[in-house]
Amino acid sequence: MFTLISSPLGSVERLIIQKQNGAELEILTGWGAGLNAWRIPTEKSTLNLLYGYQTEESFWKIQNDTSAGVRLAPWAGRTNNAIWNWKGETFKLDNNVSWAKHALHGLVHQKKWLLKSFTSNNEKAILTLAYDWTGNHDGFPFPFHAETIFTFTGHSFSVKTKTTNTGSKEMPYSEGFHPYFSLGEKIDNLTLKIPVSEKVLVDSTDIPTGMRETETRFNDSLLGDTFINDCFAIQNLVEKSETILKSSSATLSVWQNSNAKEYRFIQIYTAPDRESIAIEPMTHEPDVLNHHRELTVLQPGETLELEWGASVAIHQ
């Protein structure tokens, strides 16, 4: 069985789904529906497979730079110079980082999400959170209703998202998630395998140029000191694409539904301290609100459903 525990991180609302064997999935409902921890009991200790915030002090100190675990919508990644265009209109967003002039990660990643439901049985627990974007913002005047549905079994979780255009006009839309994964040791010691992909080429400000090149580096390859901060376009658009991270003691599979209009891209980022790696499912390249390549457009009343997740196997 599973228990839902309310355990605020200081002033930030936090829920923990706890399995009877001690496995836990921790979600910051008060901050972007963010995945904050995934703890698995092993023979020797407890393994936390997600980088997150341990104290309120560390949260407020680094959350704006890391955005760890949060849902990214109605765009993911960078919007160039915090300006975008749609049907002849220009919209101005907030430049929300100090190190670039862009707008990053959408509009819901720092919002409080509401608990809609929680159910569980012997096999799994399902937590549903909801958020309504009213459209009362000159930078994105398109209202939508969003739900994030977490299903947790202990050694796996999935995240299903639903987004409904609640306005009267067509709505451009893009989405991603921003989890940082860890296997309890430096990522230098891990191997990485990604789906067959093309690397998205970017300019000096990390905005896609429209060009891509075949990616061949990551096929069960040792990470070593490799720095990655790249977006990859998945080439075989199938129901599930897998990114696999391995250590000597565990294998982590991060999967994403990658059919047309789903998570067709992955952003991968190696954290500077080499303790974690962001593996981010994305529907589009960064800056899609400007370049419009394969842009998703939701009609009034239309709902988009997406899904990704992760599972771990422990080698005893």
Regions found by a protein language model. Give the residues of each.
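Acidic/His-leaning functional-site neighborhoods
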Residues: 102-118, 218-293
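Active-site/ligand-binding surface loops and adjacent short beta/alpha elements
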Residues: 92-93, 170-172, 179-257
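Beta-strand-rich interaction surfaces with strong enrichment in secreted/lumenal proteins
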Residues: 147-149, 293-298
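Extended, loop-rich substrate-binding clefts of extracytoplasmic carbohydrate-active enzymes
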Residues: 1-9, 85, 89, 94-153
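Short, conserved secondary-structure segments in the cores of folded domains
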Residues: 80-81, 136, 294
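Extracellular glycan-recognition regions
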Residues: 136, 224, 315
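Beta-strand-rich N-terminal accessory domains
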Residues: 1-93, 97, 238-261, 302-314
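Acidic, contiguous internal or C-terminal segments within carbohydrate-active enzymes
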Residues: 17-19, 24-25, 29, 131-173, ...
